[in-house]
Amino acid sequence: MVNLPDNVHEESFANNNASLISRLENSAFNKSNFEYLKTCINFFEKKSVNYTVVALPCSGDERKASKRPKRVNNHNMYILFNSFYTKIRRPEWPNSPTMWDTVKAHKELSDFVRVFDHTQKLGKSITSRSASSSSFTETNGKRRRSVITNVAEVQENCDQRDKLYSEFYSLLNETFKTGVAPATSNIYDSVITRELLTKNMELFKNIALKLPSPSYVPTPVSNKKRRAPPSAPKKIAKQRRDTKPPPTYVSDNTQDTNMSE
C-alpha cells in the first residue's frame, strides 16, 4: 500500500463530505424533511446526546402513483346489466359476467353500454341530493362542517332512485320482448331516446346473443313420417234393380176326381 500524507486524506474527506451534502440537498430522490432533521440535530447537540442519521427507502414510488391511469368503475353499470340480463337469460346463454365482458368488447355495443352508464349516473345524482343539505357553522373562530341529515328527504331520494331503476328495467324488458321501445317513458332524455334504445337492443340481440333476425322465422322440423294425402273417396256403383214381375208358383197337388177307379 501507498502511504499518503495526512493532508491528502483530509482534503479527500472534505471533498467527499461536500459532495455528499450537495447530493442530499439537490437530489430529486431525497424525500427527507431537512427542517425537522436540523431541529433534531440541534436538540441532540444541545443535550449532548449521541445520534445517528440513517437513510431508509420510501414505502412507495410517487412517480408510478402519479402516472397510474384512473380506472373506470364499471361495478354500478354491471349491477344494472345483471338485473336486466338475469330476467331474460336462457339456460344455454353465458352467465352475467361473461356476457357483460362480451358486450364491452364489441365497439358496436358502445351505445348500449352508455345506456347503463347514463342510468347509473342519474341514480347517483338522486342519492347525492342529501349532501347538498349540509351547512357550515363557525365555533371559536374555526370553521366546522356540521352535516344536517333529513331522514325524510333521504328516504324520499331512495324511493325515487328505486322507482327510476324499476322503470328502467321495465323499459328494457319491453324493448327486448317486442323489439321496439315504448313510445313514452320518464327515462327518455337527450341521451337515452326511443330510437337509440330500439337500435341498440337489436344490436345486442344480433351481436352478443346471436339471435336470428325477426324477419327470419325457422320452420319446425318434425321427425314423423309424412302421411300420404287422402285420396278421393271411391264411388260405390249402385246395383241395377230388375223390374221383373214376381214369379208365380203352381201347386203340385192334383185332384183325383176325374180319374177312374
Swiss-Prot record:
Disordered: region residues: 215-261
Protein keywords: Early protein
InterPro entries, alphabetized: Baculo_pp39
Pfam families xrefs: Baculo_PP31
Annotated Polar residues bias: 250-261
Protein known as: Early 39 kDa protein
